[in-house]
Amino acid sequence: MESQRNLILIGLLFVSFLLWQQWESDKAPKPAPTTVAQTEHFVPEAGQTGDIPQVSEQANANAARKLITVSSDVLKLTLDTQGGDIVSAELLAHKLEEGKDQSFVLLTSQPDRLYVAQSGLVGRDGPDSQAQGRPTYEAAQTSYQLADGQDQVVVPMTWTDSKGVVFTKEFVLKRGDYAIGVDYKIDNKSAEPVQVQFYGQLKQTVTTPKDQEGHAMVASAYRGGAFSSEESRYKKYTFDEMKDADLNKTTKGGWVAMLQHYFVSAWAPNADDTNSFYSRVIPGKDQAIIGYKAPLVDVAAGQQAEVTSKLWVGPKLQDQMAKVANHLDLTVDYGWLWFIAQPLHWLLTVFQGFVHNWGVAIIMLTLLVRGIMFPLTKAQYTSMAKMRMLQPKLAALKERFSDDRQKMSQGMMELYKKEKVNPLGGCLPILVQMPIFIALYWALMESVELRHAPFALWITDLSVKDPFFVLPILMGASMWYLQKMSPTTITDPMQQKVMQFMPIIFTFMFLWFPAGLTLYWLVSNVISITQQTIIYRQLEKKGLHTRT
């Protein structure tokens, strides 16, 4: 085995990985964009999850409808008093674009990119299932702000039905927290018992907005629904699956979510409750819903009750999400190599805690990973050197047994055994390294911490491409130099051509890769050059290598 052939193998495996990821995201036809002229609300009935009737918001159009803003240090929400939905959510600590003041908007009521968090009470006496339409709550203020010295801000909204039952819907925002408390307090002042059922759902436009579409050369991040249940810790439920069949699952605890690159919104019911999950694609509209219903709540006459829930609206912060609901941190999707990617992300975070620079942390992680893999690298080059020394004897065997492939194979195996050479010794280390690289690829791609994170000089955002393409060019140059360092006995013209163009192909690919990933590959190449130089000097002393 030759190091050049290993480079070809790396390239083919990596390109195949990218093509497979892109095919997975593109294989299903995308629906045509639909302009939504009027928002309509779907609420689940108490009972079967598949039956989600439509309730028009215009049914209660005469009510005095208002928008309320509430801000913490990390969130700015807009609440609609009709129904008490969250129709806008700005993430104050995350900007829309690097270097700009405008905050990133995760939830929005814009018709062409609708994405809202809805909740209410259905059931026999639920205000959201009444014939007159969803309730319009009253609030004391139109603006709420987390003040200095406060740990939380509470927004209470009240509505009283015709029987005198008082429903208070509260939103609780805590300092530094993206988990929103959405609670109902029910004061049954009537003479009859009341039965209600809480639901929370997320509604989103199915068609991906233009600004969220990935580049063709970079594997696209998942955008769609997901849930967690007793059977599945983390299960994606794509928009296409919602079209084929409504989600209908009953489980203890769990959560439902809408995912996109770096950010997630998720309803997390009480872990001890038995909840019903559902989904629905709205007929005639480019919109999908995923949500849950809590158990029925009975409130006797003259009694009070409270229903609580959590709603996460924010970046994919694993440590914080894990505290909100079990397995919610798995929405940071590292794919099937998660068991490698998670420790790599943890190490990256530890390094960043010391140096306070994500680019330097990537360099430190690369040094550690390549250092750990150095014994494999050394074994790889030693095996290849021994194989080169055997080339004359192998050529003689091939010439001697050119008409008898069985005897030729037997002779080669005896030669390998005699010389203590493993013919796969140069290939196996590559097969070990590739899963690590792919896992690191996803660790860097999925880490919201790298979004708008600067490195040095012109690299002001490690999550996007190098604006001046300096890193990809340096990476290509280092790959070319590494290729020139490696001795070769390749005589096949096709393989020679492939090897000549490999650095160019990789340079072109990496032009659109995130700067953080390109930095990793560049540093890895520099380390490879250093390690290869050290190994070759050791092999020269053993007579297994000569400089060309």
From Swiss-Prot:
**Localisation per UniProt entry:** Cell inner membrane
Q: Which domain of life is it from?
A: Bacteria
Q: Which GO terms describe its cellular component?
A: plasma membrane
Q: Which residues cross the membrane?
A: 6-26, 349-369, 424-444, 455-475, 503-523
- Write out the entry's keywords from A to Z: Cell inner membrane, Cell membrane, Chaperone, Membrane, Protein transport, Transmembrane, Transmembrane helix, Transport
For molecular function, the Gene Ontology terms on record are: membrane insertase activity
Q: Which Pfam families match?
A: 60KD_IMP, YidC_periplas
Biological process GO terms, please? protein insertion into membrane; protein transport
Q: How does it sit in the membrane?
A: Multi-pass membrane protein
Instruction: Tell me its family.
Output: Belongs to the OXA1/ALB3/YidC family. Type 1 subfamily.
Its quaternary organisation is:
Interacts with the Sec translocase complex via SecD. Specifically interacts with transmembrane segments of nascent integral membrane proteins during membrane integration.
UniProt function note: Required for the insertion and/or proper folding and/or complex formation of integral membrane proteins into the membrane. Involved in integration of membrane proteins that insert both dependently and independently of the Sec translocase complex, as well as at least some lipoproteins. Aids folding of multispanning membrane proteins.
Write the protein's name.
Answer: Membrane protein insertase YidC
The record lists the organism as Aeromonas salmonicida (strain A449)
- Corresponding gene? yidC
